[in-house]
A protein has these predicted regions:
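Short amphipathic alpha-helical segments
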Residues: 17-18, 39-40, 90-93, 124-126, ...
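Conserved anion/nucleotide-ligand pocket segment
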Residues: 144-149, 153-191, 197
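Class I SAM-dependent methyltransferase SAM-binding "motif I" and its flanking Rossmann-like core
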Residues: 90-91, 97-159
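Short glycine-rich anion-binding loops that position phosphate/pyrophosphate groups of nucleotides
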Residues: 33, 83-86, 117, 158
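Hydrophobic anchor at the start of a short beta-strand
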Residues: 55-56, 111, 194
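Short, active-site-adjacent cap segments at secondary-structure transitions
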Residues: 86, 118-121, 186-188
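N-terminal beta1-alpha1 cap of cysteine-dependent amidohydrolase-like domains
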Residues: 1-77, 81
Length: 200
């Protein structure tokens, strides 16, 4: 399974430019739809274009399943923006896109997860609840994540405006295998394991 998980894609995406150049990218901004600030969505879009990708944007919360399936099957890379991780995970499970995603990843496609998109890869997303509110219309009975990795990404570590909350999560969930990353770091996961890489 190939994953690239980060806090802020436009700051570190160039580290994997060879994985993006000339590739078809399914761009999922769904997590950002409930957020006030969404500047990171536009900056990610710009970087993909700069790196030579062909981008198809699709919102899994409103699009028909067959359309999502078609876009995912056609893509080389599947990218999830940051935003509200509970809303994103709810929509993934509600629409069946979670199973669709796993099927495509089994084919060797690359998933890029930024912030919320990285958090959802863990076995559960409950550990990160202090960073964002659970929507009132959250429809799941539990806080299960995609369970693609056996550790828990803590994005924006010691980075404003998340400095205090990330410190608190590190302390309160010290029993979990947390992997804190700042906005200049990314985690590369492949068949050989995982490693943190950094943008100078």
């Amino acid at each position: 399974m190939k994953l690239f998980l980060c806090s802020h894609f436009s700051s570190v995406g160039s580290l994997i430019k060879e994985e993006i150049d000339n590739k078809k990218v399914a761009f999922i901004p769904t997590a950002s739809l409930r957020e006030g600030y969404t500047g990171y969505v536009g900056s990610a879009r710009k970087l993909f274009n700069k790196l030579g990708a062909t981008v198809t944007e699709i919102d899994i919360s409103t699009e028909a399943y067959l359309t999502i399936q078609s876009v995912f099957e056609d893509a080389d890379v599947i990218y999830f923006t940051g935003g509200n991780f509970f809303f994103l995970m709810d929509q993934l499970r509600k629409t069946g896109t979670d199973k669709l995603l796993k099927k495509e990843l089994e084919k060797g496609k690359l998933m890029i997860g930024e912030s919320a998109g990285a958090i959802i890869c863990a076995p559960t997303i409950q550990y990160i609840e202090q960073m964002d509110e659970k929507p009132e219309d959250y429809s799941q009975e539990d806080d299960a994540g995609l369970d693609l990795i056996d550790f828990y990404v803590l994005p924006h570590y010691l980075t404003a405006p998340f400095k205090k909350v990330t410190e608190k999560i590190m302390t309160e969930f010290s029993d979990l295998n947390l992997c804190p990353i700042n906005n200049r770091q990314g985690i590369v996961i492949d068949g050989e394991g995982s490693k943190v890489i950094c943008k100078d």
